Amino acid sequence: MRNTGPITVTKLHPLFGAEVSGIDITRPLSPREFGPIRAAFEEYSVLLFRDQPMDDDKQIAFSELFGPLETTGSANPAAGTKFQRQSNLDIMTGEPIPPDDMRMIYQKANYFWHSDSSFKRVPSLCSILTARVCPPEGGNTEFLCMRAAWDALPPALQATIQPLIAEHALLYSRNRVQKGILSAKAIAELPPVKQRLYRDNPINGRRALYIGAHAGHIVGWPKATGEALLYELSQRADQPEFRLSHAWREGDVIVWDNRAVLHRATYYDAVKHKRFMQRTTIGGNLPTVAQ
């Protein structure tokens, strides 16, 4: 634990992640108050804030301190807004959606390790998830430290993948769940894009392995060979010592760095229990191929 100006930062994991306390992020923050939060974000990659009851306006205001927000595409129930709904509740009735409804099947892709918006030409900086309604058990969010994953790669493998380009698409991750799950409109909105296999932090220079479920193949490689490399990298990254799991309670807010971590949801009983999480996504400023 250490005091950083107006906030206290307590590590959650030896490698990454920290709880930030001593500040109310539901109110407007001055640059002096936000500065230590941004510095902690660059250092720890995942920040947890407890007991921060958010409404939509407050979440937008806090999120915009990190940068401009992405607009949600047509594949999400909150299309056209600045939010992504991660919920089993019908947006009109507030009641649980049947498990065989396409809206619930679509969300199963969140069980795969991924980085939000890696399927966009300019991938996102970070995501902010607020817990509005939590199930009594399950529904955790897990994170992988991809800085540690990169550092653990053999130098020869680092050298091999450094010049490579992967192709990412939302279609690739959704096809892992069920082919035909995306509408033609959603596919047209988000054609495949090219990403490097790493992302660098411009503040501290830390490099992170950049893969995930949206990555489909390696540009210029035979399909099977590229898929095998991506699988090998994912297996090397998914180590218990690189993993942080968070059990949500209402009022929690987590900010995570999409340049430096992968994340995934864990199972909960969506028939018995209600869950409503609301995400904002802060856009990046540079295509990874320009690194």
Model-derived regions, located:
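Fe(II)/2-oxoglutarate oxygenase catalytic core
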Residues: 2-255, 259-291
